[in-house]
Regions:
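Short amphipathic alpha-helix that is part of the acyltransferase structural core
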Residues: 3-53
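Active-site/acyl-donor-binding loops of N-acyltransferases
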Residues: 4, 10, 131-158
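A residue-level signal for beta-strand positions that form part of recognition/binding surfaces
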Residues: 20, 95, 151
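Active-site rim helix/loop that mediates acceptor-substrate recognition in acyltransferases
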Residues: 48-67
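Conserved donor-binding loop and adjoining core beta-sheet/short helix segment
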Residues: 64-107
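Acyl-donor binding region in acyl/amide transferases
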Residues: 91-145
Length: 158
């Protein structure tokens, strides 16, 4: 169950707690203060996966308002983050694109993170979630959380 934080606090603060993990929305104004803390983790993600983006792309997308950043905290310690972009298909269907999901190795926020994402889109016009990965281990984890493979992309650089 999702418990919004901040009772008695500023209503503009968006945060939710699930199974001891708090997910906090980072506003465009807060981004410049938060970015230095996540930039090294964004670099880790690009090194592990063949990402077609660089950390500065994330900063620009969140700053523009087209993308949302949520930080995760466990026991009041930074545990990871989600970078999310709502997408519209040509048919008008809306999808939540999980651009980047990161959990610090010493924390396991995936169960709470998927539950957070499920609850985040409830009551919206978003009909599904998707992410891309070239890492084969994600096929097992994705299936466990209700995701299914839709397509496989192969690329050859020329």
């Amino acid at each position: 169950q999702v418990y919004p934080q901040g009772r008695g606090m500023d209503d503009t603060e968006k945060s939710w707690t699930i199974d001891g993990v708090t997910f906090k929305h980072v506003s465009q104004e807060e981004l410049k203060f938060v970015y230095n803390n996540i930039e090294s983790d964004l670099n880790r993600v690009t090194q592990k996966a063949s990402a077609d983006w660089i950390p500065a792309d994330i900063y620009a997308a969140v700053r523009s308002g087209s993308t949302q950043l949520y930080l995760a905290f466990k026991d009041n310690y930074y545990a990871g983050f989600f970078v999310l972009t709502p997408l519209n298909s040509v048919t008008g269907e809306k999808t939540l694109y999980i651009w980047v999901a990161y959990s610090k190795p010493e924390y396991n926020i995936w169960e709470a993170g998927i539950q957070f994402l499920d609850n985040l889109i409830q009551g919206t016009s978003i009909t599904g979630m998707e992410f891309h990965s070239d890492r084969s281990g994600w096929s097992r984890a994705a299936k466990k959380h209700g995701f299914k493979a839709v397509t496989t992309v192969y690329r050859k650089e020329v």
